[in-house]
Amino acid sequence: FDHPAEVQTLLAPFTTHRFFIYGITELSSPVDKGHLHLRPYSRSGFLRDLEDCNGVICGAGFELAGEALQLGKKLLVKPLRGQFEQLSNALALEKLQLARVMQRLDRKAVQLWLELPPNVPAGYPDTAQLITVWIENDHWQDIGSLSQEAWAQTGRVPRWDGR
């Protein structure tokens, strides 16, 4: 993970936005530095701030990115170096136009991301029910129809560029 001081340096110029930076192990209580709000681990505080925010800047792991998308938060991810899963997730999020990606802490990427409009919440389908109906209707050879139905229910049909 990036050092909290580097993250603060990255976000410091954007004084018209408030940033809540979580997981700072050196802190035992919250510290506010103007528009930068430094927070120790707090599940309840984190969930409250996640619900109230406009967007999330995070690693490209699945859990937080998925929560942010489900809540309709715009997303800027930075894959952790050497983590193949995170590189793969970042590529998928970018190709599906669900997130912006930065490979390093990049002030210009943050600025462009901050200018984006908010996302809409992702409506994830009941995939177990979709699969049940798909099998019951003997459509198991046509995985494309299952995929299309699931994506249609999210309201975010992916746009692949063929690569």
Where on the chain are the PLM-derived regions?
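Donor-nucleotide binding loops and adjacent catalytic segments primarily
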Residues: 1-55
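A donor-sugar binding/catalytic signature common to diverse glycosyltransferases
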Residues: 46-88
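A general structural signal for short secondary-structure boundary/capping elements
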Residues: 66-67, 84-88, 102-107, 122-127, ...
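Nucleotide-sugar donor-binding patch of glycosyltransferase catalytic domains
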Residues: 40-41, 74-116
